[in-house]
Amino acid sequence: MAVVADFNGDGHPDWVARNISTRQTVVVYLNDNLVVGAALAPTLPANLALIGAADFNLDIHPDYALFAPNTLQTVIGYLSGPTLIGAASGPTLPAGWELIATADFNGDNNPDFVIFKPSTRQTAVVFLNNNVVVGAALLPTLPAGWNLAGIADFNGDGPMDIVLFNSATRQTVIGYLSGAALIGAALGPTLPMNWQLVAAADFNGDGHPDYLLYRPDTRETAIWHLNNNVFVNSVFGLTLPSGWTVLSH
């Protein structure tokens, strides 16, 4: 997945590019698919993977959610724009689980952690107040061959929904949620060969989440504008320089 958030507060989602060898991150500021600027962001420690970005301390600036696979420790890196201003340990995950995303699932305006257990394909949400655990709930078990690719409110009912991607068939599916409970599903568009679905956010500001696509072999990005699960149109975005990726880890 890609790390997407509005880092400069202009109402448009931005995304984070990562240098695979140096672990430097850069925030790419966007207006829909158009690059309007960029800024150096923190270099990631060798033991930590960048998983997501959300405003954990409610200072209106998105923060980094980090995960150490070897220790199962989570860390929040507090940012002001692209600048690191502090950090705090989050929960240590149970054995066999990994942090895969962040989103507000219970509507309390505090971002939560989405965790995944590969051996059973179970997902769960860990409800947070900043870096402190206040509860947890099971999310849907993912079918074999499908992976979580994005979180957004696709049907406009308030609660977050999940979008899954099947890398073999290129098919996408939106799972509609009420809190943590699955209440329905709909097929989304099928992607072209060599492209991956890496995030969902409302890039064109029409009130409907869109797909962020990435092609690893050419490092191209594209945005597919959607109305719920229905494809509307597409635009190409930035092609990343050699050695950089939009994938979080």
Where are the language model's segments positioned?
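Trp/Gly-enriched beta-strand/coil motifs that build multi-repeat beta-propeller-like domains
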Residues: M1-H249
